[in-house]
């Protein structure tokens, strides 16, 4: 049996579904299924057969009787039906910046600048949507935003400021998604756009490291000093072991004892694996509910989860309002779980406020798994390392 982790809306209030799943082999057989006084007749065919029963919302755990009769035999048991957990799923849309994956940085920069323009237009286009379905977008890296502030007209900058202030667009603080090649000085210098953002009156308090399964420990020090409160790690398990068996929120402690709140998220396009950008509602529905079942089985401690996604299922993808339509359709059907569009920092703030006593502290480095890839550009890696060394030497000489 499966108690579906959802409450759906009907004219008679919220209802929940219990599925009786019967695996059958052999010839077609007539069966009678009786669950909690409700009776259904079903033809059992080869494979999995599902009988669905509707219940009023259960407020307390209950044992409900079940019997299945076929071929002259009756099997009886009981089903534990618990109240449906009141989940909230935050859909966090971003564009994943992957230099070289589709084209070089000089070619993709113009696209990423246009994506910010698109995001502003999509905010305008969904202003009249229900709040949970309004377009929201997180600028994953600071590089494109920094360049945007240098080249766009004042009216566009004003539009961006307005949407950032409203919480419809969020600026993240990492210049790019860094591997382990840059040294500490380079990583410190990479946070320079924070000064630019703050001089422009733009809030930026979350770092996003996507598609890299580690991050320099020095960042936990730098972020704390720079007023960056949150670190969102959008993982990618290809040829890698991802830390923890489920999404995990923890205080990441620096070598000196400073802390930032970190979230080991799922894959940085987890929502695309669900089909958030498609028009296939049934597929999306099935995968979301299956995922919440998995989180329940893994004892996930919070009632809120976040799923990152892009407008289309690829890196360097433009934003899209398709997810807004999917979220709107979901909430028209379901009372729980609730799904909403969100920016990255919203999950952190919710967890920090409601579950402070459940957040562990971890002190340690977070190394990446994909350092074997450096050999693919051995000449460039060597030039980079020599340049880093020379910069350190030159700075030392200049300081004298």
Residue ranges and their predicted role:
Residues 1-400:
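Catalytic-domain carbohydrate-binding cleft regions of carbohydrate-active enzymes
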